[in-house]
Amino acid sequence: MTLEIEFLNHLPVLINDMREKIGRSRYPLLKMVAEQTTGLILYMQLDDKIKYSKEAEYVKSFLLELVNLLKDIGIPQKILVRDEESYSWLLEFCQLLPCSLEISEKLPVIDMTTNNFFSDL
């Protein structure tokens, strides 16, 4: 099983609900896990980085969610991420599993899902 994971990139959609509280709109973060062979989205959530005082807290919360998901679906053979930053956050985690971790500029299932979602907005 190969998983595509996205958790550090902002979506190109403004959230205006906090404009009055913080004086500006912001872009949500997408947390998504997809299984590459079947094309299934196994986990998807929009999150707001403003809830976390440090990026490490945000990543820790995502890793806990990922652990819970892997308890249900099993350990993948490979995890694909889009960038060096995601890779560095997940490297030690993947070594503990163990599973391979690779950077891939394209995450086909996640890309198709986000493109389809945002083409309708």
Map each language-model feature to its residues.
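Secondary-structure boundary/capping micro-motif
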Residues: M1-L121
